[in-house]
């Protein structure tokens, strides 16, 4: 089966970084997937009255913002098209509009039709964060968060953050296309952060992966006062990891997203691509 990945591109109030186009194409190319890029542009409801329209010229200002958003979407889709053409990746594109408060919801609903979701990430980009969290919790699909600060290379070394939980198991299953193509897999367990269901859970998962013909090993680390997200990323980078796979902890509460400690720690300082499953 050929996989199809979706890439959500934000245009308001912040735009997705142009680097996301190259990183997304690099990811899908490695698993032989095609790419569907969606530019989400803003549709601002007109709530002005006659006086505010006269004094502030709100209708024209709204049209200017919407026009800028559409132009941004076109520019981002063109950037993805160039990267896809150069990388030999099959691409389809789409532009959808949504009110500001619902842009994340629209992104998550569109993502449900694909196998894996890609989202660019900048720590100070509120639109990117809203889209990423909405897709993670609302799409029902694995979400790969792509850091703006790094170029995605070959994802040859996959690091699995393993605590024996349901969401971690879901993430391992969702990462199968990447695990099958990895030259090295390392299962990492943080032993001093919370009670674990056993002492050898990392090796047990690694053994199961080896039985399936994959090159997997296990390692135990300690956070030693660091956040678990920091500990996982630092160890992944130390051993040459290219992709971190982990469960996405947290829940949604009337569009306010409450992230678990590990997930929040990862996203607050993203240093490498992370596949999250909820």
Which ranges hold each PLM region?
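Small/aliphatic-rich secondary-structure junction motif
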Residues: 1-60, 138, 154-221, 241
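Short, ordered loop/turn segments at secondary-structure junctions
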Residues: 40-43, 98, 122-123, 148-150, ...
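Short beta->alpha connector loops
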Residues: 97-101, 123-125, 165-166
């Amino acid at each position: 089966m050929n996989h199809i990945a979706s890439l959500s591109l934000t245009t308001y109030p912040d735009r997705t970084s142009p680097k996301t186009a190259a990183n997304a194409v690099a990811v899908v190319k490695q698993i032989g997937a095609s790419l569907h890029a969606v530019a989400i542009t803003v549709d601002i409801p007109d709530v002005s009255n006659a006086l505010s329209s006269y004094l502030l010229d709100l209708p024209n200002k709204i049209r200017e913002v919407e026009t800028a958003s559409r132009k941004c979407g076109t520019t981002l889709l063109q950037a993805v098209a160039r990267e896809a053409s150069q990388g030999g990746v099959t691409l389809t594109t789409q532009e959808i509009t949504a009110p500001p408060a619902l842009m994340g919801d629209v992104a998550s609903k569109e993502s449900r039709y694909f196998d894996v979701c890609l989202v660019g990430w900048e720590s100070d980009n509120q639109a990117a964060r809203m889209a990423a969290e909405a897709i993670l919790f609302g799409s029902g699909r694995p979400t790969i968060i792509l850091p703006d600060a790094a170029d995605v290379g070959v994802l040859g070394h996959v690091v699995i953050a393993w605590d024996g939980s349901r969401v971690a198991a879901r993430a391992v299953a969702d990462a199968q296309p990447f695990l099958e193509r990895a030259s090295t897999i390392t299962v990492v367990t943080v032993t001093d952060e919370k009670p674990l269901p056993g002492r050898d859970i990392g090796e047990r998962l690694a053994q199961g992966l080896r039985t399936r013909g994959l090159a997997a090993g296990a390692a135990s680390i300690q956070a030693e006062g660091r956040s678990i997200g920091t500990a996982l990323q630092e160890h992944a980078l130390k051993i040459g990891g290219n992709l971190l796979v982990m469960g996405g902890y947290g829940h949604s509460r009337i569009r306010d997203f409450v992230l678990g400690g590990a997930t929040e720690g990862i996203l607050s300082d993203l240093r490498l691509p992370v596949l999250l499953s909820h």
